[in-house]
From Swiss-Prot:
GO terms for cellular component: cytosol; glycine cleavage complex. The glycine cleavage system catalyzes the degradation of glycine. The P protein binds the alpha-amino group of glycine through its pyridoxal phosphate cofactor; CO(2) is released and the remaining methylamine moiety is then transferred to the lipoamide cofactor of the H protein. The keyword Heme does not apply. Keywords: Oxidoreductase, Pyridoxal phosphate. It comes from Listeria monocytogenes serotype 4b (strain F2365). GO terms for molecular function: glycine binding; glycine dehydrogenase (decarboxylating) activity; pyridoxal phosphate binding. This is Probable glycine dehydrogenase (decarboxylating) subunit 2. SUPFAM superfamilies: PLP-dependent transferases. Belongs to the GcvP family. C-terminal subunit subfamily. Its cofactor is pyridoxal 5'-phosphate. The glycine cleavage system is composed of four proteins: P, T, L and H. In this organism, the P 'protein' is a heterodimer of two subunits. The modification N6-(pyridoxal phosphate)lysine is found at K274.
């Protein structure tokens, strides 16, 4: 039975005339919309909204939520997404009246506590990353990437170095890296990976030149491998006059152990909604702060939060700033959660996060390599990439394995990424999962590998137990239906 057979759309449940609210008679004169808006902006007919009782609304969305899956539901090993548990103390603090009930248009003097939290969070992130200054304005990871690249662009233009139009990106990089570079107005140059899954330094030397604006790197990279030649790569890029950009997607693998700033990076962006336990996976909100070294501080987006004798204030006096990149001052609620997490864990706790994240990933990798191909057989960091090529020869593809995991109440790992690995299966267990959970997932993956050999049809036709079976994902991506259209 499919979900659409048991759960109609909320529009399809609608009964004309049914209401879910009652209001007292208005005690002020009624006015017409035409008194305030031009006729072009006024509906000619009422909006076709669902008409339901409050109880029907509650049941509809509660039932929908029961078919959803999140970190609180089960294991979510989505590689490169750091789907760790989000401590509920974060939610409690974010709901403090002094945080939840304030408005960004209030006078600075009335929100000094909130500004102090933001300033302290900036200071903590400076220490964690090894940068000299941090802005909390960017709203998410890719937004942070773009902001950091715009700073680099502004830096080069300020120095009259307008020929630097190219950003170098590894072939194993996140897809957002080349996209962000292109949106920032740069041309993308790809540097190859070597046989060990690391940046090929010899190839980097070939592509670096006077037109290089920056090299974007994730370290550890998207294969979960630490770029051991990072210091040499930094020297190569800096000698050519370029900047080194750190994609902080994988900071969970090195946090409180090593710092991007100490490796030679000039700009970093962080994903507070990932590494620092803001809830994510539902489309937002996120938080993608960037940190910079001293020579890039003048180009930070304004306003810049500063501390003076009289208190905390926003400084707009940055004539070389790239300007605002978001209304107001970032996604405050996610920043509160990240601050709470950092203060709760402390330096020693953050170090343990890294150690357990790396331990869990290596434990799983060694347990699974007997049944799946391991393209790069070496110690990994927080995540690792398997290949389903062995199963593909039996007629079972990686997408089939992912769908079969749904029958066992596991969210699938990231699949078919990074692109340099055929039939890729990228697994990131995070530090918050127990050995029992890891073992259960391992056993299931081994069982699926055995099914691929002995009964491939059961894997090829999965999932069997979910309300929604296989969707036409290609059609959904290319011809999405984004709004309800009533049948006439």
């Amino acid at each position: 039975m499919n979900l659409e057979e048991t759960m109609p759309l909320v529009f399809e449940r609608s009964i004309p005339g049914r209401i879910g609210f009652s209001l007292p008679e208005s005690d002020v004169p009624e006015t017409k919309a035409s008194d305030y808006f031009e006729q072009a902006y006024i509906r000619s007919v009422p909006a076709d909204l669902p008409e339901l009782s409050e109880l029907e609304i509650m049941r509809h969305y509660t039932n929908l939520s029961n078919h959803n899956f999140g970190v609180d539901s089960g294991f979510y090993p989505l590689g490169s997404c750091t789907m760790k548990y989000n401590p509920k103390i974060n939610e409690k603090v974010a709901r403090f009246p002094g945080f939840a009930n304030i408005h960004p248009n209030q006078p600075e003097s009335s929100v000094q506590g909130a500004l102090e939290l933001l300033y302290d969070l900036q200071t903590s992130l400076v220490e964690i990353t090894g940068m000299d200054e941090v802005t909390l304005q960017p709203a998410a990871g890719a937004h942070g990437e773009w902001t950091g690249l715009m700073l680099i662009r502004a830096f080069h233009e300020k120095n009259g170095d307008t020929k630097r139009t190219k950003v170098i990106i590894p072939d194993s990089a996140h897809g957002t890296n080349p996209a962000s570079a292109a949106v920032a107005g740069f041309d993308v140059v790809t540097v190859k990976s070597n046989e060990k899954g690391l940046v090929d330094v010899a190839d980097l030397k070939k592509v670096v030149g006077e037109d290089t604006a920056a090299l974007m790197l994730t370290n550890p990279n998207t294969l979960g491998l630490f770029e051991k030649d990072i210091v040499e790569m930094a020297e190569i890029v800096h000698e050519a006059g370029g900047k080194l950009y750190y994609d902080g997607a994988n900071l969970n693998a090195i946090m409180a152990k090593v710092r991007p700033g100490d490796m030679g990076f000039d700009v970093v962006h962080l994903n507070l909604h990932k590494t620092f336990t803001g809830p994510h996976g539902g489309g937002g909100p996120g938080s993608g702060p960037i940190g910079v070294k001293k020579e890039l501080i003048p180009f930070l987006p304004t306003p810049v939060l500063t501390k003076k004798e009289e208190g905390y204030t926003f400084d707009y006096n940055y004539p070389d700033s790239i300007g605002r990149v978001k209304p107001y001052y970032g996604n405050f609620g996610i920043n509160v959660r990240a601050y709470t997490y950092i203060r709760t864990m402390g330096p020693d706790g953050l170090k343990l996060v890294t150690e357990y994240a790396v331990l869990n990933a290596n434990y799983m990798m060694r347990k699974l390599q007997e049944a799946y191909d391991l393209p790069f057989d070496q110690v990994c960091k927080h995540e690792f990439v398997l290949s389903g090529n062995r199963q593909k020869k039996l007629g079972v593809r990686t997408v089939d394995i992912a769908k079969r995991l749904l029958d066992h109440n596991f969210h699938p790992p990231t699949v078919y990424f990074p692109l340099i690995v055929g039939e890729a299966i990228m697994i990131e267990p995070t530090e918050t999962e127990s050995k029992e959970t890891l073992d259960s997932f391992i056993d299931t993956m081994l069982k699926i590998a055995k099914e691929a050999e002995e009964n491939p049809e059961i894997v090829q036709e999965a999932p069997h137990s979910t309300y929604v079976k296989r969707l036409d994902e290609t059609r959904a991506a290319r011809k999405p239906i984004l709004r309800y259209q009533k049948e006439v």
